[in-house]
Amino acid sequence: MEAIISFAGIGINYKKLQSKLQHDFGRLLKALTVTARALPGQPKHIAIRQETAFTLQGEYIYFPILLRKQFEMFNMVYTTRPVSLRALPCVETEFPLFNYQQEMVDKIHKKLLSPYGRFYLHLNTGLGKTRIAISIIQKLLYPTLVIVPTKAIQIQWIDELTLLLPHLRVAAYNNAACKKKDMTSKEYDVIVGIINTLRKKPEQFFEPFGLVVLDEAHELHSPENYKIFWKIQLSRILGLSATPLDRPDGMDKIIIHHLGQPQRTVSPTTTFSGYVREIEYQGHPDFVSPVCINEKVSAIATIDKLLQDPSRIQLVVNEAKRLYSLHTAEPHKWGTDEPYGIIIFVEFRKLLEIFYQALSKEFKDVQIVVPEVALLCGGVSNTALSQAHSASIILLTYGYGRRGISFKHMTSIIMATPRRNNMEQILGRITRQGSDEKKVRIVVDIKDTLSPLSSQVYDRHRIYKKKGYPIFKCSASYQQPYSSNEVLIWDPYNESCLACTTTPPSPSK
């Protein structure tokens, strides 16, 4: 049977393949279809989403090149589109890697040496996925396209590439660069582009790239972003993710058909001591009742209502003041000789401005940065991102901050709104590889006791226990937005410990 190999994948005549497989044809298509799992509380009128690892173009049906072995039984005769790749300049440049990073580099390099090589790297947040990928770029010496989800991550990639591989010509591809039509791998060695821009490009744009790196690859499951896979099939592809199969609806499984099963590396021995300060907050009756849409509780609308409580906003401000005081007045007590930073997470963008205004009134001379200038001007400014690397307080949404944002001086988190998903990535913002291990990590978690969302705290407990962080409980209310003394409710060193204490763990613990 004849087939073609192109940037869209393996193309086979639809009718001939259907005739050849007969009843197995339907089974094949079903096996390559991912159907979203219905989530608790999901309205029945919302259609269940499906995504397929095949696409139809005219008389042909295209499959990911990764699946070509499944067609070997048909003695396929492939017509391959020729691709000519130039080699990048070979300059001996060394930069340090941890042992686990070097082992993974060797493994990835071996896999990507083969034509149409694929590798899906699963490495926890903060452990150096970017540095591993840059080492692969240096070894393969192919013109490379790096696809990232946000401008913040794009800037981090540019900075890291420029630092580690200064001999290469590196450029950022964004909406402004789109006007420069000749900006391709002929002019640059490595191009770092944002998915929202690149997914609109024709397949000819991707032709000169011998290697494509997909940062946060698990996020490419969305209907629009997923289309990128049908334009890069001829390239070697390296996917990077800290949470490759973590979506509640299971839609990120579609990525496996293109990249293969995620491959984990041996976890490093670096540990960060820390603890959780869980505040049971009793909100004002006017703000704690659930908001229902189509007879189902809406988490987003309920959170929006919770944050209309001025006392709850003040509680967050008070906790920020408490942490800042600990960090600056008595830094030696917390395992450091200098102040360090606080990240305040909220659920959605409009809350960033609310908390920024509230914090600004209390912190007159403290640098507070909100990198997501997108809430005002449609994009993140380079200035805001640069300021964030020295700021004492950073405000982020969960959706923006859970991605590969790196601020190594940040060691405390305040979760200003409830959260259930992506907690591994959220905590990863204060446990970056290469940051100071001596500094105690502190997580402030507010549990709204009268809200239907209060049960989400138990999902967070699971992650805290996995990290080995003891949990200290205290209380506050709309009448008294200052938290009470702490009570130890879980101790990683004594599972049954329910002793009362007001003393946080020491750095040595």
UniProtKB/Swiss-Prot annotation:
InterPro entries: Helicase/UvrB_N, Helicase_ATP-bd, Helicase_Restrict-Modif_Enz, P-loop_NTPase. PROSITE patterns: DEAH_ATP_HELICASE, HELICASE_ATP_BIND_1. ATP binds at L123, N124, T125, G126, L127, G128, K129, T130. Residues 110-262 form the Helicase ATP-binding domain. GO terms for molecular function: ATP binding; ATP hydrolysis activity; DNA binding; RNA helicase activity. It is an enzyme of class 3 (hydrolase). The keyword Nucleotide-binding applies. This is Putative ATP-dependent RNA helicase QP509L. Its EC number is 3.6.4.13. It comes from African swine fever virus (strain Badajoz 1971 Vero-adapted) (Ba71V). SUPFAM superfamilies: P-loop containing nucleoside triphosphate hydrolases. It catalyses: ATP + H2O = ADP + phosphate + H(+). SMART domains: DEXDc. Belongs to the DEAD box helicase family. DEAH subfamily. Induction: Expressed in the late phase of the viral replicative cycle. It holds the Pfam family ResIII. A motif (DEAH box) lies at residues 215-218. Signal peptide: none annotated. Keywords: ATP-binding, Helicase, Hydrolase, Late protein, Nucleotide-binding.
